[in-house]
From Swiss-Prot, chains A, B:
Transmembrane segments: none
Record key words, sorted: FAD, Flavoprotein, Metal-binding, Mitochondrion, Oxidoreductase, Transit peptide, Zinc
Residues reported to bind (R)-2-hydroxyglutarate: R400, T404, K415, N457, H490
E.C. no: 1.1.99.39
Binding positions ((R)-lactate): R400, H490
Gene Ontology molecular function: (R)-2-hydroxyglutarate dehydrogenase activity; FAD binding; zinc ion binding
Annotated InterPro entries: FAD-bd_oxidored_4_C, FAD-bd_PCMH, FAD-bd_PCMH-like_sf, FAD-bd_PCMH_sub1, FAD-bd_PCMH_sub2, FAD-linked_Oxase-like_C, FAD-oxidored/transferase_4, Oxid_FAD_bind_N
Annotated control of activity: Activated by zinc and cobalt ions.
Residue sites binding Zn(2+) per the record: H448, H455, E489
FAD-binding PCMH-type domain ranges (all copies): 110-289
Cofactor(s), by name: FAD
Protein name (record): D-2-hydroxyglutarate dehydrogenase, mitochondrial
Binding positions ((R)-malate): R400, T404, K415, H490
Length: 535, 535
């Protein structure tokens, strides 16, 4: 049972559906040999078996919805297939049914028509594949767990899909320093489990953990739920191995916390969304597993109170504050309606989830109790509940983590992932509700408040050009006016590549294009993604 | 007085010279207008007035000691000087005496013969200067506080010195988020004071704080004393403004914690040591000022005990551990001999400095006391002392921070800054003592143990080619064998540029050269630095 903290708090029983798990996806048992699963038993595409993808109406082909022209790449020929088969025998997939899931993104908003999926196991194989594609001028779409939010993870036309799903080996783990070196296709949740057994945790965590790959996380510079405490992958990733467009293997897979020998090349690939190279292995430093974790789930009467609660937490919890997430009442309704999760506290306009992670259960509980007393007594919080044991902690987290899933069940989702000055974070949501009126089914706001990161989502029965027109460029212009970012953590992928200019000046865009030309002169890696098409 | 923690600890009076300050340099009062000092009163080069530089024998000209050829850049003409005078009237320095200090590095190991020092105040001025130099093919040496350790901060021949000393304005500070935006020439210690008054701290700290500039810190990707807790500048620097070789201003000066719009260009400039662009402004996130800081200074009987003490601290102090530094007994002798600092504890083979920073004085003291009891009782530590008030904390820190200064007073210093597996960190010091015998005056080891970072220093009466031959490439090969880094935090600059290959594979070096060619096609920015000369 979730422990009510003080008597006036809600003591209702929390969970309607008792058997659910923290990770919503039907997580596949991916063949992490050293993580204890024998490889033979997995069906090749099990890791993509989301219920939200399977079934439902066919997703519109990307070029039918978006104005995009195929670039003059070659088309995969029988000879190409034979060459691939030589490099990775038995792992060249051309079966249309198996290809279907890899051609469609998690949100079911874009669809490519690739005819071939390649499943290498080693960097050497990736290198040989790219060498071949480079020579043959074949476009390539690197794919991890395919949980990306911006249409970057699937082909736009017939690009070869290069999946890291079978590159799922832990290479080494140092149990004093906590430095993990692994292949790019390791599933984040598997890695989490692996390092937790050794008394460490992964420095990042996100709702997609059951499916996303560490390589995909690095390629998107994923933020997620622990960013507030453990910072960006730019600090925690120590090394990368990357295969360049022409097949050259760039080995920067060092396991050193500090290394200032020359330019830090790995940084170019972090967040480059598969457009500059294919990440094949990652070295990452894991923080020690905290001895005590507490989660409080609180109801706030207004957004001003959410902000004030954050300030109070930051001031009083200091170094043990490990997450501060918020969601509005519409989010709560959606997780209730679509996923049958029950609100553990009184209905409120806003909810926040506060997590502490520390090295002394007693000290942490004392700090958190002081905070909770203060926010309750001052009226910043009207109701709340707290959990310390792992199962209950996960239950509370699910309310926040499964919002993305609930939204995707609500209809077509227009997704915006913005960095904004924290004081103005919620204004845009209110503004849009008025602007869109009944044209939108739901306009919701939630996200990583502690990082100034708003997930603004608008759902509708179906994709609608008119609704899109009401949203864009309005949302981007609004954000730019606040000097915010039009993509805080999801990247630009296919769907946001043309809005780069709202957050970056022309000089920067030109430099990015030069960098792309330097590393991928033929432009075969994830074309139509990240950078606006050149004039 | 420094409080003895438990009765068996040393209670001797600590400090021979009562009047000393934490920062050893004769720190200049640099004209940070908004930081409270009127600009008019400073002599132009006051910030370089180190006693260790002034006086003493003339430093050998770099090309006389090192095999390096001047590249075919133009020579500064009267017309160039007139053009500079037009851009920055009154701030073009050609007086040989004033130029002397800017031509010699802090360690007095390299000397250039530049005839002109430029002191712009704005990015626009930097842009105009570089536009002129680019057109005229004049080589440029960006210079911050000139505290660099690898000869990167001074000209090798007659490069134009472009100093950020007058670019010392705070642009903005947000007192909720702690995000500071400032010009590149702000002195780290001034910034520290500025943000501390607002209840934040800088995420980095180093012994050179009284002189080094934030731009120089970013240009060298400085690590320093808070790296263990607050991580790398790659995570804490949020934005940069950079002037490119041709004078183009690249404005990536965002103040957002998260921004995944396109490639993160600022990363290319962090740690690029002035070879890819001139950093003119920095946006950096400052952590809240901890409410309680404790420092313990401990004596350990051996290096194995140092390591075990570290593990104990990490395990028991967890999130409040903010520094773990070590030094050997020779270091202590040198700070005693050259700086008259007194050892606060019993003489020991090794000393460690443990710092905690947290949000509850009571909780932190309790945690630290538990640790200290444990390490004393188990014999890992034989003597120690602890401090909580700021003055005493600074006194203990000085023992560690002033080692660099003590070494520079001991004679010519051969400096190595290595990342090594922590278990083998001290082996190389022992090995070298045997190898060098009486040829070396002192062979000492100290550094950021918590980050696996050893500062290995060898002193001699004077520079000696023979001693150099005994040290190099031996030290680099030894490090490479351990898969370490031949420059953990100091960068490569002029003196280490040719050893890049010990830590990076040829593919990486080639890519770095391409990056340099892309951003600085004429190679005018800090030539002869960071990258090995191309064949
Ligand atoms: C429920 C849910 C919650 C989420 N929560 C968060 C969150 O909190 N924070 C956040 O930042 N993101 C979040 N995301 C989106 C996030 O981008 C992804 O979940 C994750 O980082 C992508 O990993 P992936 O392996 O699925 O990559 P994919 O989706 O397969 O690919 C993403 C991009 O990276 C490229 N890529 C993938 N692997 C490689 C590789 N090895 N080398 C080069 N390029 C590669 C692809 O080409 C594509 O452009 C969430 C997504 C979902 C579905
Ligand atoms: C006593 C002492 C202690 C030190 N401790 C540490 C430590 O703990 N950790 C650590 O990492 N380092 C340490 N250092 C070395 C460290 O590199 C410097 O102190 C500091 O980061 C350099 O800053 P600076 O402003 O003095 O730069 P400079 O020495 O002036 O320049 C260093 C390099 O950066 C370039 N540069 C400077 N400013 C700019 C700019 N605005 N744009 C582009 N390029 C620029 C220069 O061309 C040069 O290549 C120490 C040095 C001393 C003397």
């Amino acid at each position: 049972m979730v422990l009510p903290l003080v008597s006036r708090w809600s003591a209702r029983v929390l969970w309607a559906s008792p058997g659910w798990r923290r990770t919503y996806t039907q997580r596949a048992c991916v063949g992490l040999k050293r993580l204890g699963c024998p490889r033979g038993v997995y069906s090749p595409l099990a890791h993509r078996a989301y219920s939200v993808v399977a079934g439902g109406p066919e997703v519109t082909l990307t070029p039918e919805r978006y104005p995009v022209q195929r670039l003059p790449f070659s088309t995969v020929s029988e000879e190409d297939l034979a060459a691939f088969e030589c490099i990775i025998p038995g792992r060249v997939i051309t079966d249309p049914e198996q290809l279907q899931t890899c051609n469609v993104d998690w949100l079911k908003t874009v669809r490519g028509c690739s005819k071939v999926l390649l499943r290498p196991q080693t960097s050497e194989e990736v290198s040989q594949i790219l060498r071949h594609c480079y020579k043959r001028n074949l476009a390539v779409n690197p794919q991890g767990g395919n949980t990306g939010m911006v249409g970057g993870s699937v082909p736009v036309f017939d690009e070869v899909i290069l999946s890291t799903a079978l590159m799922n080996q832990v290479i080494s783990f140092h149990d004093v320093s906590g430095i993990l070196v692994c292949q790019a296709g390791c599933v984040l949740e598997e890695l989490s489990r692996y390092v937790q057994e050794r008394d460490f945790i992964m420095p990042l965590d996100l709702g997609a953990k059951g499916s996303c790959h560490i390589g995909g996380n690095v390629a998107t510079n994923a933020g997620g739920l622990r960013f507030l405490r453990y910072g960006s992958l730019r600090g925690t990733v120590l090394g990368l191995e990357v295969v360049l467009a022409d097949g050259t293997i760039l080995n920067c897979l060092t396991s050193l916390r500090k290394d200032n020998t020359g330019y830090d090349l790995k940084q170019m690939f972090i967040g480059s969304e598969g457009t500059l190279g294919v990440i094949t292995a990652v070295s990452i430093v894991c923080p020690p597993r905290p001895k005590a974790v507490n989660v409080a789930f609180l109801g706030c009467p207004g957004f001003a109170e959410v902000l004030q609660t954050f300030r109070t937490c930051r001031g009083m919890l200091g170094e043990i504050l490990s997450a501060f997430e918020f969601m509005d009442t519409e989010c709560m309704q959606l997780v209730g309606q679509h996923l049958q999760l029950t609100n553990p506290v009184q209905e409120s306009p806003f909810y926040v989830l506060v997590e502490t992670s520390g090295s002394s259960a007693g000290h942490d509980a004392e700090k958190l109790t002081n905070v909770l007393e203060q926010v309750l007594n001052s009226g910043l919080v009207t109701d709340g509940t707290m959990a310390t044991d792992q199962r209950k902690v996960q239950m509370l987290w699910a309310l926040r983590e499964r919002i993305t899933e609930a939204l995707s069940r609500d209809g077509y989702v227009f997704k915006y992932d913005l960095s904004l000055p924290v004081e103005r974070l919620y204004d845009l949501v209110i503004d849009l509700r008025t602007r869109l009126g009944p044209r939108a089914k739901h306009v919701v706001g939630y996200g990583h408040l502690g990082d100034g990161n708003l997930h603004l989502n608008v759902t509708a029965e179906a994709f609608s050009r008119e609704l899109l027109g009401a949203l864009e460029p309005y949302v981007y212009a609004w954000t730019a006016e606040q000097r915010g970012s039009v993509s805080a953590e999801h990247g630009l992928g296919f769907k946001k590549k043309d809005v780069l200019g709202y957050s970056k000046p022309p000089v920067a865009v030109t430099l990015m294009q030069q960098l792309k030309a330097m590393l991928d002169p033929e432009g075969i890696l994830n074309p139509y993604k990240t950078l606006p098409a050149q004039a």
